[in-house]
Amino acid sequence: EIIELSSYMEDEKLEIAKRYLAPKQIEKNGLKDNKIKLSDAVLKKIVSEYTREAGVRTLEKTIAKVCRKMAYQVVEQDIETPKVSVKNLHEYLGAPIFIDQEREKKPQVGYVNGLAWTSVGGVVLPCEATTMAGTGKLALTGSLGKVMQESGHAAMSYIRHNAKSLKIDEEFYKKLDIHVHLPEGATPKDGPSAGITMTLAMVSALTGRKVRADLAMTGEITLRGRVLPIGGLKEKLLAALLYGVKEVLIPKGNEKDIPE
C-alpha cells in the first residue's frame, strides 16, 4: 500500500525554519554568541523565493549558506553582529530564484486560472487562449505532457460538438485556428485536471466573453462535457487562497473531499 504525504505548506516551513533550522545553523556556524537572529520576514522570503520543494532539505541548506557568509563577516571582516534583512538578502543568496506572478486584476478574454498539483504542492496555472484566421488547427504550447495535450483536444472536440448551445459559430473551425498556452514554458506540465480550464479559455476566446480574474477551476473534461474528479484538492485550494482567488469551481465528484 502506498501512503501519500502532502508537502509542507509555506507557513509550516516557516515555523520549522524558525524553531529548528535557523537555530541549528546559527549554532553550527559558531554564531550563537554573536546574538545573530534571522527575522520571520527573512525566513519567509527564503522559503518563498529561494526554495521550491515538498520538504525542507533545500531550505536548511539555504539557511546554512546565509549563516556561513555571516560567519565569514564575523571572522574576516570583523563585523560582530551581521544584519540580514529582506533588503540585503540578495547579498547573501543572489537574486531570487522563484518569483510568483501577480494575479490579473481585471476580467480577461481567453484567460482562465487553472489549478495544478505538483510534487511541491498546489499551484495556480493560468491558461491563455487566442484565435486567428486559419483552418481549425489547435496549437498547444507551454511544455505540456501527452495527457494534458489530449485534454486540450478533448476540449476542442466538445466545443465543436456543442458550438450552437455555446453560442459559437458552428463553422468556426473552417476559418479559425486556436492557440492555447500555459505560461512558464520551461516548466513541464501534465495531467488531465486542466481540461475544464482549457475548455473555458477556448470558449472565452471564441465568444469574446470575459472570465473573472478572481475565479479558478480544476477538473478533467470528457467529450460529453462531464467534469471528472481530480486529486490534490487540498493543495490546490491552498494555492488558490494564497493567490488571492475568491471562488474555485471543482468537480461534483470532489464534494466529499471538502471536509478535509
Predicted segment positions?
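Conserved catalytic-core segments of large NTP-driven translation/proteostasis enzymes
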Residues: 39-144
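Walker A/P-loop NTP-binding motif of AAA+ ATPase domains
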Residues: 1-7, 228-229
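Aromatic side chains
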Residues: 8, 20, 50, 92, ...
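Peripheral, non-AAA+ core regions of ATP-driven protein-machinery
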Residues: 81, 102-103, 108-113, 121-260
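Broad structural signal for hydrophobic residues in well-ordered alpha-helices, predominantly aliphatic
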Residues: 25, 89, 202-203
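Residues immediately C-terminal
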Residues: 2, 65, 223
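Conserved C-terminal "switch" segment of AAA+ ATPases
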Residues: 6-64, 69-82, 165-175, 209-214
